[in-house]
């Protein structure tokens, strides 16, 4: 909004001219989302506590230390969604189609997550909305987004870029739509599975969003994309502002979500954040890089899949003491804070590996 209002005056005012730069607006987005989180956090937490008598249901078969979390409210992802969307509406170019497509997906996945959290709180169990129903809704939203990109996007939308290789792209044809849906839905659920400890998912999400802030900026810049031999996709630079807002809102949320958490982001936050990262990776044609940068989410998801299939194949045996993987280490006696910090370190390593693919070709 501010960008569009100030655009006619960029040549007459130094202040207005600053808004012409994506980097300035991105930095401002971080400041705004952080500030909004600090201001609205206590109010939202108090409101959620008044509505949720028992807070988020805690699994009885989980680590014993988790019973101390009883009564902690969920749906804190509302804070992240509101602050990120407000900063994007204020600072991004509202004539940019990618801005609106991404916001649509972000909010839609947030609504699905809210429905799931609401079902858990009202039923007082950790099951919520049926898994198949959630997958169906996620698939429908992802399909709509892919169709919008297919008909509104003039970029090479069927190409899958392979990182670390020069000019290597696979043309998936119309199968790319199926692949893109898988990326978006998979990303959404992978983040959801990772969000099991205080602050565990928040920092890796911030690292991933920060990485895609850089990727969006480079892909949307003709000079930088040519220099790095990336597929140039005009106008994706505006997604940098949204990604920066995600970084700020996640860091602001971490203030209240650090152990011991005052609030959980819930599926409202995890499904929406995972979904929006998947959408941005599809738009920027860096789907495989998302799997690298978000390697922690991939590992957590793989641990669940392996556990389930091995359990069925062996009729009751398990690979891990408990899945997802972070619970396995808790069962081994690791303190929650140790698991969280070590997983943060792993996520930093994955982010650096993913970003190195931009240059190593």
Curated annotation (Swiss-Prot):
GO terms for molecular function: metal ion binding; phospho-N-acetylmuramoyl-pentapeptide-transferase activity; UDP-N-acetylmuramoyl-L-alanyl-D-glutamyl-meso-2,6-diaminopimelyl-D-alanyl-D-alanine:undecaprenyl-phosphate transferase activity. One of its GO terms (cellular component) is plasma membrane. It is a multi-pass membrane protein. It comes from the Bacteria. Keywords: Cell cycle, Cell division, Cell inner membrane, Cell membrane, Cell shape, Cell wall biogenesis/degradation, Magnesium, Membrane, Metal-binding, Peptidoglycan synthesis, Transferase, Transmembrane, Transmembrane helix. Its cofactor is Mg(2+). The keyword Isomerase does not apply. Its EC number is 2.7.8.13. The chain crosses the membrane at residues 28-48, 74-94, 99-119, 133-153, 168-188, 203-223, 236-256, 263-283, 288-308, 338-358. It is an enzyme of class 2 (transferase). It catalyses: UDP-N-acetyl-alpha-D-muramoyl-L-alanyl-gamma-D-glutamyl-meso-2,6-diaminopimeloyl-D-alanyl-D-alanine + di-trans,octa-cis-undecaprenyl phosphate = di-trans,octa-cis-undecaprenyl diphospho-N-acetyl-alpha-D-muramoyl-L-alanyl-D-glutamyl-meso-2,6-diaminopimeloyl-D-alanyl-D-alanine + UMP. HAMAP family: MraY. Catalyzes the initial step of the lipid cycle reactions in the biosynthesis of the cell wall peptidoglycan: transfers peptidoglycan precursor phospho-MurNAc-pentapeptide from UDP-MurNAc-pentapeptide onto the lipid carrier undecaprenyl phosphate, yielding undecaprenyl-pyrophosphoryl-MurNAc-pentapeptide, known as lipid I. This is Phospho-N-acetylmuramoyl-pentapeptide-transferase.
């Amino acid at each position: 909004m501010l960008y569009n209002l100030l655009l006619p005056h960029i040549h007459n005012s130094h202040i207005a001219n600053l808004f012409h730069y994506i980097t300035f607006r991105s930095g401002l987005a971080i400041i705004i989302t952080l500030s909004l989180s600090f201001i609205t956090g206590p109010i939202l937490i108090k409101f959620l506590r008044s509505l949720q008598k028992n807070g988020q249901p805690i699994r009885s078969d989980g680590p014993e230390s988790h019973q101390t979390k009883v009564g902690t409210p969920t749906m804190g992802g509302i804070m992240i969604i509101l602050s990120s969307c407000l900063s994007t509406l204020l600072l991004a170019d509202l004539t940019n189609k990618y801005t609106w497509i991404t916001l649509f997906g972000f909010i839609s996945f947030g609504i699905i997550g809210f429905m799931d959290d609401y079902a858990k709180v009202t039923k007082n169990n950790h099951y919520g909305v049926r898994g198949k129903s959630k997958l169906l809704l996620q698939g429908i939203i992802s399909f709509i987004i892919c169709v919008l990109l297919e008909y509104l996007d003039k970029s090479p939308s069927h190409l899958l870029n392979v990182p670390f290789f020069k000019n290597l792209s696979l043309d998936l044809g119309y199968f790319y739509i199926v692949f893109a849906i898988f990326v978006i839905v998979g990303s959404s659920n992978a983040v959801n599975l990772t969000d099991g400890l205080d602050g565990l998912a928040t920092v890796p999400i911030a690292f991933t969003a920060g990485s895609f802030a850089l990727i969006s900026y480079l892909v949307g810049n003709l000079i930088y994309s040519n220099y790095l031999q990336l597929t140039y996709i005009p106008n994706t630079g505006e997604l940098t502002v949204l990604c920066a807002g995600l970084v700020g809102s996640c860091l602001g949320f971490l203030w209240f979500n650090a152990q011991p958490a005052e609030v959980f982001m819930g599926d409202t936050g995890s499904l929406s954040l995972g979904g929006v990262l998947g959408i941005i990776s599809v738009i920027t044609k860096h789907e495989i890089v998302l799997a690298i940068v978000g390697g922690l989410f991939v590992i957590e998801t793989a641990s669940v899949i392996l556990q389930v299939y091995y359990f069925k194949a062996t009729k009751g045996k398990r690979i891990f003491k408990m899945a997802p993987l972070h619970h396995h280490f808790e069962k081994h006696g690791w303190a929650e804070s140790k698991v969280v910090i070590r997983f943060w370190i792993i996520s930093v390593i994955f982010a650096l590996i993913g970003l190195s693919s931009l240059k190593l070709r």
